[in-house]
Amino acid sequence: MALLKISVVVPEGEVYTGEVKSVVLPGVEGEFGVLYGHSNMITLLQAGVIEIETENQKEHIAINWGYAEVTKERVDILADGAVFIKKGSDDRDDAISRAKKLLEDASSDRLAVSSVLAKIESL
């Protein structure tokens, strides 16, 4: 299976870059998955969790909002704010706390935020 290149960038710099099997993005019309060979598109992203599947594991990045450009070979994400939640890292609990704060500040829609926070807590 061909791998998809992905980059997640915020105003402060790069949060994540790599080659992945797939990525699930929190689009404004709902979550959608991207594999290598996906149709080209540019879309708005809402507060949520980006799910990245690599060869060995799943990784997660919480964002408050942003844009995604999808081509057949890559996904470039420009987000206003993002927190990389890495499994097994020493600062995972701190990352989850920062992700919760980022999402709570992102939207006044309590129901949507609660749903995303529940997803983060299950990681």
Curated annotation (Swiss-Prot):
CDD domains: F1-ATPase_delta
Membrane topology: Peripheral membrane protein
Location(s) in or outside the cell: Cell inner membrane
Superkingdom as given in the UniProt entry: Bacteria
Quaternary structure (record): F-type ATPases have 2 components, CF(1) - the catalytic core - and CF(0) - the membrane proton channel. CF(1) has five subunits: alpha(3), beta(3), gamma(1), delta(1), epsilon(1). CF(0) has three main subunits: a, b and c.
Function: Produces ATP from ADP in the presence of a proton gradient across the membrane.
Protein name: ATP synthase epsilon chain
